């Protein structure tokens, strides 16, 4: 393989990664969310959403209603949580939300940060669920939970880039 072919392969790979990054950033700006697409990681929202479903978020709603499904993050925890709004309180300055998973027996008070009784709509919410694709996100779960699958996928990607002729 000559140097020109190697440069072409590198540029093709760089093009794929930069296109994916640009698509992600475009979706982030349109949805007004740092994470416009999330994967359901647990069964707490069954039967509405199953583990492995991909959710599409929108964060341009000014007020959430009881029954809306929202994704939120808690300070100090890196994994976003998908749950339904159980109660809401608002005044002219902010909206406070209490959430609960459809498949959970109790509300999310124990999941919130210490001394936090409600979610702040502007600070804690990643977005409101507007659509989903069932089971497509299961690949992400397999990659994060199974080290052999992760290294196997990386190996296949590496081999395919080495042996491709384009």
Swiss-Prot record:
Keyword match DNA repair: no
GO cellular component: signal peptidase complex
Topology feature Lumenal, residues: 31-166
Main location: endoplasmic reticulum
EC number: 3.4.21.89
Residues on Cytoplasmic side: 1-9
Transmembrane segments: 10-30
Reactions the enzyme catalyzes: Cleavage of hydrophobic, N-terminal signal or leader sequences from secreted and periplasmic proteins
Active site: 44, 83, 108
GO MF entry, a single one: serine-type endopeptidase activity
Membrane topology label: Single-pass type II membrane protein
CDD domains associated with the record: S26_SPase_I (cd06530)
Keyword entries, A-Z: Endoplasmic reticulum, Hydrolase, Membrane, Protease, Signal-anchor, Transmembrane, Transmembrane helix
Span list, region C-terminal short (CTS) helix: 152-163
GO biological processes: protein targeting to ER; signal peptide processing
Coiled-coil stretches: none
Subcellular location: Endoplasmic reticulum membrane
Keyword Membrane: yes
Entry-linked InterPro entries: LexA/Signal_pep-like_sf (IPR036286), Pept_S26A_signal_pept_1_Ser-AS (IPR019756), Peptidase_S24_S26A/B/C (IPR015927), Peptidase_S26 (IPR019533), Peptidase_S26B (IPR001733)
Comment block on domains: The C-terminal short (CTS) helix is essential for catalytic activity. It may be accommodated as a transmembrane helix in the thinned membrane environment of the complex, similarly to the signal peptide in the complex substrates.
Family: Belongs to the peptidase S26B family.
Assembly mode: Component of the signal peptidase complex (SPC) composed of a catalytic subunit SEC11 and three accessory subunits SPC1, SPC2 and SPC3. The complex induces a local thinning of the ER membrane which is used to measure the length of the signal peptide (SP) h-region of protein substrates. This ensures the selectivity of the complex towards h-regions shorter than 18-20 amino acids. SPC associates with the translocon complex.
Function: Catalytic component of the signal peptidase complex (SPC) which catalyzes the cleavage of N-terminal signal sequences from nascent proteins as they are translocated into the lumen of the endoplasmic reticulum. Specifically cleaves N-terminal signal peptides that contain a hydrophobic alpha-helix (h-region) shorter than 18-20 amino acids.
Name of the protein in question: Signal peptidase complex catalytic subunit SEC11
Record organism: Candida albicans (strain SC5314 / ATCC MYA-2876) (Yeast)
């Amino acid at each position: 393989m000559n140097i020109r072919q190697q440069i072409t392969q590198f540029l093709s790979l760089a093009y794929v990664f930069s296109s994916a990054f640009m698509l992600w950033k475009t979706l982030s700006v349109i949805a007004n969310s740092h994470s416009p697409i999330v994967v359901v990681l647990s069964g707490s929202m069954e039967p509405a959403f199953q583990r492995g479903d991909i959710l599409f978020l929108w964060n341009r709603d000014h007020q959430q209603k009881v029954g809306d499904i929202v994704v939120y993050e808690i300070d100090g925890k890196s994994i976003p949580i998908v749950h339904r709004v159980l109660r809401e309180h608002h005044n002219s300055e902010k909206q406070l939300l209490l959430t609960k998973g459809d498949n959970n027996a109790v509300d999310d008070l124990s999941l919130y940060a210490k001394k936090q009784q409600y979610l702040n709509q502007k600070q804690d919410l990643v977005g409101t669920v507007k659509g989903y694709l069932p089971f497509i996100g299961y690949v992400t779960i397999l990659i994060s939970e199974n080290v052999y699958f992760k290294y196997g996928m990386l190996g296949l990607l590496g081999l395919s880039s080495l042996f491709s002729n384009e």
